[in-house]
Regions:
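Short, low-complexity N-terminal intrinsically disordered segments enriched in polar/charged residues
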Residues: 1-35
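A broad, low-specificity signal marking well-ordered, structured residues that form hydrophobic/aromatic
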Residues: 5, 77, 92, 113, ...
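Generic secondary-structure microfeatures
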Residues: 19, 52-56, 81-83, 98-100, ...
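Short, charge- and proline-biased low-complexity linear segments
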Residues: 30, 64-69, 128-135
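Short helix-adjacent coil turns
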Residues: 36-47
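Short solvent-exposed beta->alpha transition segments
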Residues: 50-79
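Surface-exposed, charged secondary-structure patches
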Residues: 68-105
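Short beta-strand edge/turn micro-motifs at domain boundaries
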Residues: 107-135
C-alpha cells in the first residue's frame, strides 16, 4: 500500500520523501515549505534542521525539536498565497494554514514564511528563514 504525502501532494515516495532522504533539493520555496510540513508530520528532525539556519548550537536545536515534534498531530496543509520563490528567484514567501490536533483539541496555525537561497545563489538550495508577521 502506498501512503499519501502529508503535504497534500502525491504519493509520499514521489513527493517529499526524496527531499527528506537528500536525493534532491526543493526546486521552489513552496516545495520546501510543503516538505518541511511533511517533515513535522513525520518526525523528520534532521531534515528540519538542515533546512533552517540558526545560530543556536545544533545539538540543542536537535534536542528541543525532537522533544516538541510529537506534541501535535498535523492533519492538513492549505497554501493560501505564494509570492516569488520560483526556480529563478533568490527569495519568496508562502502563506499557509496548517491544521492540527493537540490532545483532542483542533487548531490552525497560520503563517507567512520567508524563504531564501543558501549563499544567496541560484545554485544553492532553499532554506526557511523566518515567519513574517501576518497582515
Amino acid at each position: 500500500m502506498q501512503n499519501s504525502c502529508p503535504c497534500g501532494g502525491f504519493l509520499y515516495s514521489s513527493c517529499c520523501a526524496p527531499l527528506h532522504r537528500g536525493e534532491r533539493q526543493a526546486a521552489t520555496a513552496e516545495q520546501l515549505m510543503r516538505s518541511r510540513y511533511s517533515a513535522y508530520a513525520l518526525g523528520e528532525v534532521e531534515y528540519l534542521l538542515q533546512t533552517q539556519p540558526s545560530p543556536v548550537p545544533l545539538a540543542r536545536r536537535r534536542r528541543e525539536l525532537a522533544a516538541s515534534i510529537g506534541q501535535l498531530r498535523w492533519q492538513r496543509l492549505q497554501i493560501l498565497a505564494v509570492t516569488d520563490g520560483g526556480p529563478h528567484d533568490l527569495s519568496g514567501t508562502v502563506t499557509f494554514e496548517a491544521h492540527y490536533d493537540a490532545a483532542g483539541q483542533r487548531g490552525v496555525m497560520r503563517e507567512c514564511s520567508l524563504f531564501g537561497r543558501a549563499g544567496n545563489s541560484l545554485d544553492c538550495g532553499w532554506l526557511y528563514l523566518e515567519a513574517l508577521e501576518l497582515a
